[in-house]
Regions:
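Extended C-terminal subregions enriched in glycine
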Residues: 249-296, 303
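C-terminal segment of N-terminal export signals and the immediately downstream linker at the start
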Residues: 23-54
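Active-site-adjacent structural elements in enzyme catalytic domains
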Residues: 40, 51-59, 66-136, 140-147
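Short beta-strand scaffold segments in enzyme catalytic cores
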Residues: 88, 101-104, 197-202, 208-210, ...
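Active-site- and interface-proximal helix/loop "cap" or "latch" segments in soluble metabolic
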Residues: 45-49, 59-67, 226-272
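C-terminal binding/interaction regions
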Residues: 100, 110-191, 280-315, 320-326, ...
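N-terminal secretory signal peptides and thylakoid transit peptides that target proteins
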Residues: 1-16
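Glycine-rich anion/phosphate-binding loop at the beta-strand->alpha-helix junction
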Residues: 147-150, 154-241
Length: 350
């Protein structure tokens, strides 16, 4: 039988339409889970969000939108000059410039927004939400992200606090023994952070949101963007399933799209704990040899946090000792992360 070009194209269109209408093709042999209402409102965050989860939870109980609530929660850290991992006072890049990244996702509307390499604006999470609310785009970066923020009414300020500037100068002095910078304060330990805050929430109606915000890796190459502003890596939510996010070495997470992967594992029926632990296994499997010790263990840490539509939650890290923040009707608290390796198996971190 001879097949014409038109027959071939029509057959392809028909097959594509059929595939689009068959959700089981995306999930192996199992059908999509039946959506359920949340058992209770709950907020889950990285450990540095302990104050923020309480703020977010109270707003959710007061029937505020889940995304507005968790952004208000992370704003606490963004505006705290003593927190050197996000926002105002965040540790700068190698040029001494604070560059911020953030992304957010709103489950009920299936919308998202993000900014990367944003300078002089202390609350990148709010700018990311403005990108979501007022544009047809998802991500804006660099000077144009700042221009957008200023046009939207955000106020500029110098984000480099004196404390962070002094840490940067100490790092710069010790960078190269043969340079022209004199070393001082030998007894002062220089911080080297991958600091970030991720927060996820579900309300009593089962609506879910997620946000991640960061100043990124301390002393990074100017222009570096990690996983935080990448929807599907630094954070992700699906209103029918749950949400997930991460903190730690962003480069390791980007390669596995960790937040998306965790949500997909939960869609398949895995518990939040099983999902985030399986993501960490995938991260380690995808790690290049130079970042592994002789026993195949990572020379970095990475944490994931996840919750489901019905209010189950978990946190996980590569090594024992990690904590994450939770708030529900029992109050705000820190809980232990699940882990891949025990504390005494941790190699010396670079």
């Amino acid at each position: 039988m001879t097949i014409t070009r038109r027959d071939f194209i029509n057959a392809g269109v028909t097959a594509a339409a059929g595939a689009a209408l068959t959700p089981t093709l995306l999930h192996g042999d199992s059908a999509l889970p039946t959506p359920s209402r949340a058992a209770r409102p709950i907020v889950v965050s990285s450990a540095n969000g302990l104050r923020g989860v309480k703020v977010a939870y109270d707003k959710i109980v007061a029937r505020e939108d889940t995304l507005d609530a968790i952004i208000a929660g992370v704003n606490i850290q963004e505006l705290d000059p003593e927190d050197q991992s996000v926002g105002l006072g965040g540790l700068p890049n190698e040029e001494g410039v604070v560059q911020l990244d953030a992304s957010c996702m709103h489950g009920p509307t299936k919308r998202a927004g993000a900014v990367g390499c944003l300078e002089d604006i202390a609350t990148p999470s709010l700018v990311a939400k403005a990108v979501m609310d007022y544009t047809d785009h998802i991500m804006l970066v660099g000077p144009d992200a700042k221009r957008f923020a200023v046009n939207m009414g955000f106020k500029t300020q110098n984000l480099l606090t004196e404390k962070s500037r002094q840490d940067w100068l100490r790092w710069k002095a010790r960078l190269n023994k043969g340079d022209n910078w004199l070393d001082h304060d030998d007894d002062v330990r220089i911080k080297f952070t991958h600091g970030t805050i991720n927060m996820n929430a579900v309300n009593a109606a089962g609506d879910i949101s997620s946000v991640t915000t960061t100043s990124g890796r301390a002393w990074k190459v100017a222009g570096r963007v990690g996983d935080s502003p990448i929807v599907g890596a630094g954070e992700y939510c699906d209103n029918e399933v749950g949400a997930a996010g991460s903190t730690g070495r962003g480069e390791a997470n980007i390669k596995v799209c960790g937040a998306f992967l965790a949500v997909e594992f939960m869609r398949q029926g895995k518990s939040p704990q099983e999902a985030v632990m399986q993501v960490i296994q995938r991260v380690i499997a995808m790690t290049e040899k130079r970042l592994l010790d002789p026993n195949g263990r990572p020379l970095f840490d990475l944490e994931f946090y996840a919750l489901t539509k019905d209010g189950r939650y978990a946190g996980a890290s590569c090594y024992e000792g990690g904590k994450f923040a939770v708030c529900d009707d029992k109050g705000a608290r820190l809980e232990d992360c699940g882990f891949m390796y025990k504390r005494d198996q941790r190699p010396k971190m670079p």
